[in-house]
């Protein structure tokens, strides 16, 4: 491959202005992200801990292998919606490493509206299932949910890709032989009750986890009978009477250890092996991306200046260099992985795009001047990253996940 040479003037006034603006934007982004990942209100967090329950992120930390990263997905879902009462849409999703294998983790955050689902919660849950399905990754549900958020039920239930799709996906995952493990760590009411019932193996925590379609108040209203939540759908009932749950746990920590034991040898298809090469650092400092992205969005940027600061050794084998010149396509390596790159800085000629995309079984990095969109397909892992926020993604996705 040829080594790209930069024509960028890093001492120019424009570069310094761009860098200053985007460092400011990055700081703002990190501040919003931190606030959004704190969970519910301090009062809700305190009440959660009083019940001797671990927080959702603490549960994930215990599940994944020590000193391994957790690639969180959709962390800003629900941001600036519903008066920001649904940080991270009340659910944490991502990919972690359990016994050396990538595993999709979906954890309800009960400190946010009792772990209930509004429209963005549903979409975030579905997206995580889709990633598990397309990449044949084991799926772990850490269930602590009151089901649908009833004040917003008109936006949760009606659509094809709304609440019921979760259970459709569970059936498909099961049919594909992809393991699904549910840990019932709190309330599983109404729609939330179906998740553990449809999983391959279910763990339930004593005096804490409950599974029922309607709780004690509904039973009393319908039949006049008074029962406790534990009597109606607790760990003892579901492990010894109904058989809905398979494993009885004393507390959150015990439940997570049982889950790790189950995942020690899952029957799941081996992921595809990619031909990797030794890793090389880019010849140009990736932090220069701050100065490349223009403050004025109307100004175009040569995507090669971006590519040479991302790929190994700044080496790039361009494909169809003289055809549809507003699109740059080619091959490179990132962290030793073979990558196909598509970048545009003008009109996107779909004929060139389609020709390039017919190559199978490669990671695809799409650099688009106008939008940010993530795409996952069965035969390729495609990521679309806006030049405007590439500097933000660089230090989260690239450093944590590909390493």
Specify the residue positions occupied by each region the protein language model found.
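Amphipathic alpha-helical
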Residues: 51-77, 284-316
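Non-catalytic terminal/interface segments that mediate subunit docking, oligomerization
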Residues: 76-107, 111, 133-134, 298-358, ...
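Conserved catalytic cores of soluble enzyme domains
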Residues: 143-271, 403
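Structured core elements
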Residues: 95-97, 104-106, 140-142, 181-184, ...
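N-terminal amphipathic, basic-rich helices that act as targeting or association modules
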Residues: 1-97
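Short hydrophobic targeting helices and cationic amphipathic motifs
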Residues: 367-372, 376, 387
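Terminal amphipathic helices with adjacent charged low-complexity linkers/tails
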Residues: 250-302
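Thiamine diphosphate
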Residues: 111-137, 145, 150-202, 347-358, ...
């Amino acid at each position: 491959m040829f080594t790209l040479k930069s024509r960028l003037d890093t001492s120019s006034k424009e570069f310094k202005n761009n860098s200053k603006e985007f460092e400011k934007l990055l700081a703002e982004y990190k501040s919003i992200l931190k606030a959004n990942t704190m969970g519910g209100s301090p009062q809700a967090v305190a009440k959660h801990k009083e019940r001797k329950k671990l927080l959702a992120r603490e549960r994930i930390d215990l599940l994944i292998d020590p000193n391994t990263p957790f690639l969180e997905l959709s962390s800003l879902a629900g941001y600036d919606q519903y008066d920001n009462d649904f940080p991270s849409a009340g659910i944490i999703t991502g990919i972690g490493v359990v016994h050396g294998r990538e595993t999709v983790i979906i954890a309800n955050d009960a400190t946010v509206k009792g772990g209930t689902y509004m429209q963005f919660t549903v979409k975030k849950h579905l997206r995580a299932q889709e990633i598990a399905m397309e990449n044949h990754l084991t799926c772990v549900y850490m269930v602590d949910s009151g089901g649908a958020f009833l004040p917003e039920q008109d936006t949760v239930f009606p659509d094809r890709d709304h609440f019921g799709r979760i259970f459709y996906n569970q059936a498909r995952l099961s049919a594909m032989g992809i393991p699904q493990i549910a840990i019932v760590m709190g309330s599983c009411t109404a729609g939330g009750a179906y998740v553990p019932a449809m999983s391959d193996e279910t763990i339930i925590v004593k005096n804490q986890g409950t599974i029922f379609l309607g709780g004690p108040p509904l039973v009393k209203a319908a039949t006049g009978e008074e029962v406790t939540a534990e009597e109606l759908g607790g760990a003892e009932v579901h492990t010894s009477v109904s058989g809905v749950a398979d494993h009885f746990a004393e507390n959150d920590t015990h439940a997570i250890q049982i889950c790790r034991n189950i995942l020690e040898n899952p029957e799941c298809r081996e992921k595809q092996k990619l031909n990797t090469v030794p890793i090389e650092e880019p010849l140009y400092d990736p932090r220069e991306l701050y100065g490349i992205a223009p403050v004025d969005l109307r100004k175009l940027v040569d995507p090669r200046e971006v590519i040479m600061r991302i790929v190994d050794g700044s080496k790039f084998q361009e494909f169809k260099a003289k055809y549809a010149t507003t699109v740059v396509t080619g091959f490179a390596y990132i962290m030793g992985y073979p990558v196909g790159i598509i970048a545009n800085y003008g009109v996107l000629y779909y004929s060139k795009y389609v020709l390039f995309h017919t190559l199978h079984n490669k990671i695809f990095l799409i650099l688009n001047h106008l939008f940010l969109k993530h795409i996952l397909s069965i035969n390729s892992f495609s990521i679309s990253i806006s030049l405007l926020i590439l500097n933000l993604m660089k230090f989260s996705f690239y450093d944590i996940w590909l390493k």
